[in-house]
Amino acid sequence: MNLPWALLLVLLSHRQLLPWLRTVGETSLNDFYSEAQAKLFLQFYEQTAQVVLNEFMEATWNYVTNITKQNQKNMLQKEADRSQFMLYFSTRARMFRTDHFLNQDVKRMLRKLQNIDKSALPTEDLLEYNRLLTYMETAYNRAEVCLDEGPCLTLEPDLQEIMATSRDQKELLWAWQGWRDAVGRQLRPVFEDYVRLSNKAAQYNGYKDMGALWRSKYESDTLEEDLEQLYKELQPLYLNLHAYVRRSLYRYYGPELIDLRGPIPAHLLGNMWAQSWNNILDLVLPYPTKAPEDITAIMKIQHWRPEKMFEEANLFFTSMGMLPAPPAFWIKSMMEKPADGREVECHTSSWNFYKFNDFRVKKCTEVTLEDLLSVFHQMGHIQYFLQYQNLSVIYQEGASPAFEEAVGSVIALSVSSHKYLLARGLLSQPHQDSEEEVNFLLGIALEKIAFIPFSYLVDKFRWKIFDGTISKITYNQEWWNFRLKYQGLCPPVPRSDDDFDPGAKFHIPANVPYIRYFLGLILQFQLHEALCEASGHVGPLHQCDNYNSKVAGKILGDLLKLGSSRPWREVLQEVTGESNISTKAFLTYFKPLMDWLVTENVKQGDTLGWPDFSCSFEEKITSKVSFLGTDTEPEQAYLGQWVLLSMSFFMLVLILALGFRLHYLEKQLLDEDTMILKTLPYSYFLGIAMEPHQAARKQWLLLGLCCILMLCCIGLLIRIVTQNTENTPWMKNEGQS
C-alpha cells in the first residue's frame, strides 16, 4: 500500500487525525497546539515510527547483505517512504510553540523530531540524493583491484591483508594506488552533486550547510574551538610517536623512501588509510628480544571462529551484570563473509531494527586480534541498543555520536589488558617487566595515538567543502594538504585533482560523519578511568580490567539506559564528575610510554614534525585546457575540435567535387570544335579573363592549396587531442616513489 494512504488509515484508526481536521476554520489554534496535544502527537509518532523505521531497516539490511538491483530498488522505495513519513511529522512538530511548555522532555522530543536530515528535501531532490548515495556506496563496495594476470582483489580481506602483512613497498604501492584509482575516480564526477544536495537538505532543516547540521548533534556552540583545543593537547603524543616510527621505518626501508625530517609515505604504515599502525609493530618494537606473544596465532591454534569471538564479547558484558545479546542476534547477524557468492557490504556496522530485541551486526570477521577488538566495539553498540530500547524511538541513539563510539571501545581497553588476555588463555607469561610494558603500550599507541589526527581531519576537511572554503577543483589537493598538516603523511606517488583519494575511505561515500570517532577516542579513556576507579582498581590505568565488575557494569548500564534523553554533558557529569570531554585520562594512560618516547627521540636527535616539507602533487589550479593558443573549458575545447574535424571533412568533400568538376570541364573544352574555341577565346578565374589552359592551371594550384590547408587542420586537431589525453608520468611507472 502507498505510504500516504497507509499513514492516513493509521491516523484515522488511532483517532489522531480528527483533531487536526477539526482545526480548519477555528479562530484559534492555541488549544490544538497545546502541550497536551503535543503529548498525543508524540504518542502517535511513537506508534507509527516503529513500523516505518523497521521496514526501512529490513530493506536496507537485505540490500547490504545481498547487493542486487531488486534489493536496491526495494531499499530506495522504503527510504522514500521513510523520508515522506519523517517530513510529515517534522513539519507538524514545527507548528508547536514550545516556549511556554513546562515539560522539558516534550520540548526536547519535539526539537529532535524537527531535524530530519535529508528527508527535508523536495521529492525530486530526495530521489536524486538517494540514488547518488546508493551509487557512491555501491561503487565502493564493488570496487576491485586486478592483477595483470590473475584474480581481482576486493578490499576485505584481500587488499587489507596485503597492507597489513606485506613488507614489499612495491606490492604495498600497487594495493594502495590500485584501491584509490578503482574507487576515487568513480566518485569524483558525482561528489559535487552530493555536496550541493547535502547543503540543500541542511538549509531545509534550518542550517547554513551540512557541516553545521552535523555539528548540531553535539549541542555545543563552541564545538570547533573545543575540538581544536583537544587536538592541541594530544598533539605532542602524536608527534613523538610519529618521529619514533619514522626512524624505525628508516632503518627498515632506508633513505630512498624515508626522510628523517619529512613526512612518512602513506602506504608503509600497515593500513589502507594509515589511520592505525598496529600492523607494523614488528618493525617498530622498542625491545625486539621481548616481543609480545602473537595473539592472532594463538587464536588460530585454539581454533577460534568468528562466532566464538562474538560469544567472548557477549560474555564480557554479562560478567559485568549487563544484558546478553538476544537469540535473534545470533540467528540474523552476518558475522563473516558469506561463502555463497553473494555480493555484500563488508564494512563493519551494528543495526537497530526498532523492534523488540532485534539487533544485528554486519561484519566480514577474520580471526585476528584486531578483529577481536572490533567485535567488542560492535557488541558495545548492541549493548547500547539493548539498554535504551524501552525509550521513545526519538531517544534511541547515544547521548551524542561520540558516546556511541566510546562504549564498545571502553570495554576493548579492558580486553587489551595483560590481565584479561592472560585470564582468557591468550597469553602465557604471567607478568610484564618494564621493557615488556613499553612494548605493550606502544602496541596500543599504534592504534589509539596514531588515530588522533586522522579522526580529527576527515570531518574538518568535509566541513570546509560544505561551507565552500574548498572548491571542487582542489578536492584532492586539499585532502593531502590536511593529511600532511595533521598526520605528517604524503602519497607515495604524485596525485592530481583527477583523483579523489578521500573517496577511498568508506565514510566519505557512505555519508557518515567522522568527528564522533575523534571525540569517542578521547571519551573512552575518560569513561574507562571512571569505571576503574569505581571498581576499586589500584595501579596504572593501562593495567585495569573491568571483567566481572558488577559496580562498573551498573554505572555503564545506567548511562546507556538514558539514550539521548538528556544532554550529553549531564550524562558525562554523572559518570565522571566532569561536564566536558577531557584528555587527562588519555594522557595518564600513555604517560609511561610518552616518557620513554621523549627520552628515545632526544637520544636519537630526532626532529618532531616535518618542517618545510610538502607533498609532491600534480597541481591543476584550473580545469581549463589550451585550444588554439587560448585557455578554455574542456567541454568547449572538445566541441571546437569536433567543429574543426567537421570543417575539414566538408572541405575534403568540396575539394573533391571541385576537382571532378574541373576535370570534366577541361576534358569537354579539349573535345569541342576549334571554331567554337575561337568564338570563346577566354575563360575566367576569380573574375579575370584568361586563356583556358591558364585558368585550368590556376584552378589546380588552388585545389592543391586547399588540400595543404586541410592536412594542416587535421594535423593540428591530432596534436590537440594527443596533448589533452597524454598519460601522467606516475601512471606509466608503478614503481616510482
Swiss-Prot record:
Chain positions recorded as chloride 2 binding sites: 218, 516
Organs and tissues of expression: Expressed in sperm and testis (at protein level). Expressed in heart and testis. Not detected in kidney, lung, liver, brain, ovary, spleen and thymus.
Residue intervals annotated with topology Cytoplasmic: 661-700
Signal peptide: 1-23
Disulfide topology: 146-152, 346-364, 532-544
GO molecular function terms noted in the UniProt entry: metal ion binding; metallopeptidase activity; peptidyl-dipeptidase activity
Disruption phenotype: No visible phenotype. Sperm have normal fertilizing ability.
Positions annotated to bind chloride 1: 180, 479, 483
Ranges that cross the membrane: 640-660, 701-721
Name used for this protein in its record: Angiotensin-converting enzyme-like protein Ace3
Annotated source species: Mus musculus
Gene: Ace3
